[in-house]
Amino acid sequence: AQLCESLGHRIEPVSLPVVLPELLDHVFTIIGANTRNHVDMLGRMRGFDVQDAELEARTRIILRDKGNVSGAQYTAAVEWIHALGRQLATFMQDYDVVLSPVLTREPARIGELVVPDMSLSLEDMIERSHRYSPFAALFNASGQPAMSVPLYWSAAGLPMGAHFAGRFGEEGVL
C-alpha cells in the first residue's frame, strides 16, 4: 500500500461486503457438484468408474461432503455467487482497485498444505488453506479481473505479492 501511495495513488482502508465462511460454503457447493460431474464423466469416458485410490484426499473430502448436492442446492449457490458479483460491482463504483496481500504469510513449504487422509472435515480443510490465502477466493468467485504481483522479497528470499482486483470489464486498469 505504501508503494502505491508513493506512486501517487490514494489509499483508503475498506471492508469488503462479504462473509468468507458463507462465500466458501457456496463456492464449495459449486466445486463439489462440478467435481462429481468431472469424476463421473471421466469414468464414462474410460469405461469404468474412478476409484477412490485414484483421487487425492482433498478431492475425496470434497466429494464426500459436497459431491451429492441437489440441483436446487447447486442452483442456489450459483445464484448467490451471481448476487455477490452484483453487490461487488456496486461496491466497486467508488474504487478503481482493491489491494490486498496475496498470502497472509510467506509461501508455504512444499507439501505443507497437503491433505494426507480423509480425517479432516471439509470445513477444516477449507479453513486451513484459506487462513493462508483468504483474499483471492472472493474475486475468483465473482469473476472480477484481478492479478497477483510479486512486489518484494521476504527475509528468507521468497517472493511476496500484492493482489489487485478491479471493476468488471476494466482489465485495462490493472
Residue ranges of model-derived segments:
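Structural helix-boundary/capping segments
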Residues: 1-10, 64, 75-79, 86-89, ...
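Short, Asp-centered acidic motifs that coordinate Mg2+ and/or phosphate
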Residues: 96-97
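Gly/Ser-rich, acidic/histidine-flanked active-site/gating loops
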Residues: 1-33, 62, 67-73
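Short, surface-exposed loop/helix-turn segments at secondary-structure junctions
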Residues: 25, 108-133
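Basic phosphate/pyrophosphate-binding loop/patch that engages nucleotide-derived ligands
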Residues: 92
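Short, hinge-like loop/turn segments at secondary-structure boundaries
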Residues: 28-32, 116-118, 165-166
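Generic alpha-helical structural context detector
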Residues: 2, 25-32, 40, 100, ...
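Short helix-loop capping/hinge segments that flank enzyme active sites or metal/cofactor-binding pockets
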Residues: 30-89, 101-106, 110-112, 150-159
